């Protein structure tokens, strides 16, 4: 065996195995008879780098994938890329200082595709460097025709089932991105705004209203009061004039009006929020659209038309203040809906869009058929589903996304949706091969594209072979994902799977948390708490980062990144390497009868295998790896190896060969247990030990070993080491001898080495006596009480026979130089004797030790 370096070189080891590993080992075998385990891997947006949050999630997935392979499953761990959508478009616009409307449609898409391809290549490198066992044979890229043809076919199938429709409806709109977005894509933030109090005049007096959106005055279609609010109920059924814009609107009563907010009177605009939409529908109000797709006021705003929302708000407020219409202003903290990508406040516009029908009962029923880890995360989906009021808006006014396969007849306006056999296609490039029902052959293409969630929500169907294989394998076994996209990716995937194939998408959904910086806040470059995986790779290696992921917390909980945990992980790897370096020359796959301490260790190892297996089945990675660490450091290194060192260094014997065989077996099993977590160092150790790859081995199982004698030997060895340490002795310091009194028949050869002393094993209990040998005055009690007399008292006490002092204290009174001495003022030093010789006694539950020190 070549010499093993003292220090573990993670860079050398990790780079070596990245070069040597054959990725085909991880490929899914469609013809295998093994039970399948298909993972619906999250396809990240390839817009930047593979960040630390991705690393956490992919570590979780890899722990499962490697474990399941070792348990005999045919595992598919594919890698997908969710290319389309706003993230890439926004990045292109920022990078090239353009908007989607400033360059030809095809040129803008080309820029998006190029940027996406570059990001995918960067992220692939990081995934590989992290040691992820990806099945690259099942990689998918949603911007490629072979994937988005399935998105288009799913659109056509759902349209033909009546689950997709097109109509005018209020939608969330981002003025900056100039596109509709779904409610699930709206983020909320608390912002300080201004509540403006103003007067709406009428022939019956004025009605005072408070609003934070004066720029929506030209969109006002009614004013509402609570029917139980006696202050304003007299205005109901009458009209008031909208200030500045001089048109009348009716005053309505509605129980949804909050009498305690502002003046208790609200203006209903089309649209300020979802409540406005409810009132608009319920009261059959007219539509006045004051804001256009670009976030500018329309012509109904008169002289304010063409202004941006911000400009118009300021101009309208300034004029109303100058005319005395606004009579009061006050700050207000308000929850504002924002575009999930660019953080621009959203508007609600009435637009003709494409929608998917939502069936909440079906989604909730299906969610109940899926195992959720942790279970409480299911409530997030149920709560979100229970609040759904509108169907899913799936059309987007962008470029880089799956084209909606539809056209509009120029003559009659009829919608023509493509047939499945025509797909894939882009309607802006391809005309339908058939005429319209009216006989016309002239069509306008649908230029809107699909929401990117229409791509990723069929990922579970795609990886299980839907539309591409005659033997699709749905449902998948696992969906791992973050809790932040339960209301989007999880929700939409369940919806689409049930709509398209009537089967739940997966058997289990595993939820991971978010990664926080060391300050406990969300990671952000602006907060200077941002860490990238490559920084950890360079300083400590991939295995250290994977340990942090395993130990960071249980699934579902947010995880704080801490460099001290990375450093601790590196220390553990060095400890593991040191164990291997010590054991390698001795470890041997040989047959020999195990000794008591060997059987004890194998029993502990068996319990570890059971504990880790249970934890892995429950996705409790922290429990699994914490148990492995504790066993490796405390049981194997601190206990067993220290106990058997003398046996290993001794001459050849059955006992020595038993220790060698035990070390071999323990290293073999430990490497297999740790392989899903730290694949690099375990591969290095295992191949050196066995000549085989640990990642092609099965999960360990052990016969049951029990050895109460071995457990007692470990306890005695620990007591002897503790005894020496407490007395400042070297652990290899010799002792004159040790007598062990116990009812168990112990093997003593290892204890002789631990104690560096002859060992005598005896039955029963030792015959010992105790005597007082010295008196130690306690100055902290004597000094303060007797002050100047203290010296004489102490001198007298130390000159007395300790046995006499002890007897006098037992009688309740000692008087010296006229001073009363109480028990707390004196410590009696005793020694224990056995057969007239001084000994130290160590009492354990199942044994008593008499220790004779060296003279």
From Swiss-Prot:
Catalytic reaction list: tRNA(Val) + L-valine + ATP = L-valyl-tRNA(Val) + AMP + diphosphate
Subcellular location, record wording: Cytoplasm
UniProt GO molecular function: aminoacyl-tRNA deacylase activity; ATP binding; valine-tRNA ligase activity
Keywords: Aminoacyl-tRNA synthetase, ATP-binding, Cytoplasm, Ligase, Nucleotide-binding, Protein biosynthesis
Residues that bind ATP: 525
One annotated Gene Ontology cellular component of this protein: cytosol
SUPFAM superfamilies registered for this protein in UniProt: Anticodon-binding domain of a subclass of class I aminoacyl-tRNA synthetases, Nucleotidylyl transferase, ValRS/IleRS/LeuRS editing domain
Short motif ('HIGH' region): ranges: 44-54
GO terms, biological process: valyl-tRNA aminoacylation
Enzyme nomenclature, EC number: 6.1.1.9
Class of this enzyme: ligase
Xref: Gene3D superfamilies: HUPs, Isoleucyl-tRNA Synthetase, Domain 1
Motif 'KMSKS' region per UniProt: ranges: 522-526
Main localisation: cytoplasm
Keyword Protein biosynthesis: yes
NCBIfam families per the UniProt record, alphabetical: PRK13208.1 (NF009687), valS (TIGR00422)
Its biological purpose: Catalyzes the attachment of valine to tRNA(Val). As ValRS can inadvertently accommodate and process structurally similar amino acids such as threonine, to avoid such errors, it has a 'posttransfer' editing activity that hydrolyzes mischarged Thr-tRNA(Val) in a tRNA-dependent manner.
Family as reported in the entry's similarity comment: Belongs to the class-I aminoacyl-tRNA synthetase family. ValS type 2 subfamily.
Matches recorded under PANTHER family: VALINE--TRNA LIGASE, CHLOROPLASTIC_MITOCHONDRIAL 2, VALYL-TRNA SYNTHETASES
Annotated protein name in UniProt: Valine--tRNA ligase
Gene: valS
